[in-house]
Amino acid sequence: MAIKRRKISVIGSGFTGATTALMVAQKELGDVVLLDIPNMEGPTKGKALDMLESTPVQGVDSTITGTSSYEDTKDSDVVVITAGIARKPGMSRDDLVATNAKIMKSVTKEVVKYSPNSYIIVLTNPADAMTYTVYKESGFPKNRVIGQSGVLDTARFRTFVAQELNVSVEDVTGFVLGGHGDDMVPLIRYSAAGGVPLTKLIAPERIEEIVERTRKGGGEIVGLLGNGSAYYAPAASLTQMVEAILKDKKRIIPTIAYLEGEYGQHDLYLGVPTILGGDGIEKVIELDLTEEEKAQLDKSVQSVRNVMAALPAE
Ligand SMILES: NC(=O)C1=CN([C@@H]2O[C@H](COP(=O)(O)OP(=O)(O)OC[C@H]3O[C@@H](n4cnc5c(N)ncnc54)[C@H](O)[C@@H]3O)[C@@H](O)[C@H]2O)C=CC1
Ligand SMILES: O=C([O-])CC(=O)C(=O)O
């Protein structure tokens, strides 16, 4: 049988969705379908066509199609969900929960109907609770429903550390644990530059400032943009996750994963280090935590559980 290109559908053609579609196509990961609600069909088709017309210049053979019909997403290998509302200055991600939970449910029904074997990656905020909502609604196994927070949060941390040390971002590694909120837990003990622990390179007070900036990294961009939230780094993060799955790379990266006892948590989606490969989340990696790290993680878990308690009833 002829080998076919992979198919990636991106639901929501706003800032994050459109940017993800472009980045995924530029990496030639497969053919991309960009979907939004019927009211947005014109702009969605327009963005997709504009991106498609960039492919000859870029030298990539990925198609990009804009649509408002789920028929066009049929048999996707990976579906990325970015549909929903974004926060504005003065709002927290948690303020989006009621509206976006409804959107997650309706989107998931269609994704399951048309792409029953897909891997779903959820970006929509509040991301931990929205990934949980999609998991429950889909009935998919836990490895096939994955949320995005840690690649982005870690990328922000790595950016700030590289700036501080004036070294390549490539050589800085880090791990951010916990919910995608201001209580997230950047794990300094597991962070390094060129393999050298950060604690040997940066003074504790500066590390604390970098941690604080990372925690509030989303809010910093919201404040600067004035009318929406970050999209370039989020799209790059989603693209890395799509690539890890489609190329079965078995990347060790933090994702929002379903926990059944790991880190002492049950029935919860939370940001943790995972192995992401051809079967989605192939493993949750459990790190040893100090008492202080555990306390920080517990605080973050409590914040996620508070948001989950605000999820609309079935
Ligand atoms: N987890 C993370 O790290 C990040 C999460 N986000 C979240 O991603 C979401 C999207 O952000 P942006 O793209 O900037 O927002 P945006 O407002 O630019 O785009 C959202 C799009 O979703 C569409 N949409 C709404 N309901 C829909 C439905 N039922 N079906 C299909 N499409 C629908 C809208 O028409 C709009 O085009 C927000 O909730 C934001 O908070 C954004 C950045 C990072
Ligand atoms: O801050 C927001 O609302 C969007 C987001 O999750 C991020 O950029 O980390």
From Swiss-Prot:
<keyword id="KW-0816">Tricarboxylic acid cycle</keyword>
<feature type="binding site">
    <location>
        <position position="36"/>
    </location>
    <ligand>
        <name>NAD(+)</name>
    </ligand>
</feature>
<dbReference type="InterPro" id="IPR001557">
    <property type="entry name" value="L-lactate/malate_DH"/>
</dbReference>
<keyword id="KW-0560">Oxidoreductase</keyword>
<dbReference type="GO" id="GO:0030060">
    <property type="term" value="F:L-malate dehydrogenase (NAD+) activity"/>
</dbReference>
<comment type="function">
    <text>Catalyzes the reversible oxidation of malate to oxaloacetate.</text>
</comment>
<protein>
    <recommendedName>
        <fullName>Malate dehydrogenase</fullName>
        <ecNumber>1.1.1.37</ecNumber>
    </recommendedName>
</protein>
<feature type="binding site">
    <location>
        <position position="125"/>
    </location>
    <ligand>
        <name>substrate</name>
    </ligand>
</feature>
<feature type="binding site">
    <location>
        <position position="156"/>
    </location>
    <ligand>
        <name>substrate</name>
    </ligand>
</feature>
<dbReference type="InterPro" id="IPR022383">
    <property type="entry name" value="Lactate/malate_DH_C"/>
</dbReference>
<feature type="modified residue" description="Phosphoserine">
    <location>
        <position position="149"/>
    </location>
</feature>
<dbReference type="Pfam" id="PF00056">
    <property type="entry name" value="Ldh_1_N"/>
</dbReference>
<dbReference type="InterPro" id="IPR001236">
    <property type="entry name" value="Lactate/malate_DH_N"/>
</dbReference>
<dbReference type="GO" id="GO:0006099">
    <property type="term" value="P:tricarboxylic acid cycle"/>
</dbReference>
<feature type="binding site">
    <location>
        <begin position="12"/>
        <end position="17"/>
    </location>
    <ligand>
        <name>NAD(+)</name>
    </ligand>
</feature>
<dbReference type="Pfam" id="PF02866">
    <property type="entry name" value="Ldh_1_C"/>
</dbReference>
<feature type="binding site">
    <location>
        <position position="100"/>
    </location>
    <ligand>
        <name>NAD(+)</name>
    </ligand>
</feature>
<dbReference type="InterPro" id="IPR036291">
    <property type="entry name" value="NAD(P)-bd_dom_sf"/>
</dbReference>
<feature type="active site" description="Proton acceptor">
    <location>
        <position position="180"/>
    </location>
</feature>
<comment type="similarity">
    <text>Belongs to the LDH/MDH superfamily. MDH type 3 family.</text>
</comment>
<dbReference type="InterPro" id="IPR015955">
    <property type="entry name" value="Lactate_DH/Glyco_Ohase_4_C"/>
</dbReference>
<dbReference type="InterPro" id="IPR011275">
    <property type="entry name" value="Malate_DH_type3"/>
</dbReference>
<dbReference type="GO" id="GO:0006089">
    <property type="term" value="P:lactate metabolic process"/>
</dbReference>
<keyword id="KW-0597">Phosphoprotein</keyword>
<dbReference type="GO" id="GO:0004459">
    <property type="term" value="F:L-lactate dehydrogenase activity"/>
</dbReference>
<feature type="binding site">
    <location>
        <begin position="123"/>
        <end position="125"/>
    </location>
    <ligand>
        <name>NAD(+)</name>
    </ligand>
</feature>
<feature type="binding site">
    <location>
        <position position="93"/>
    </location>
    <ligand>
        <name>substrate</name>
    </ligand>
</feature>
<feature type="binding site">
    <location>
        <position position="87"/>
    </location>
    <ligand>
        <name>substrate</name>
    </ligand>
</feature>
<keyword id="KW-0520">NAD</keyword>
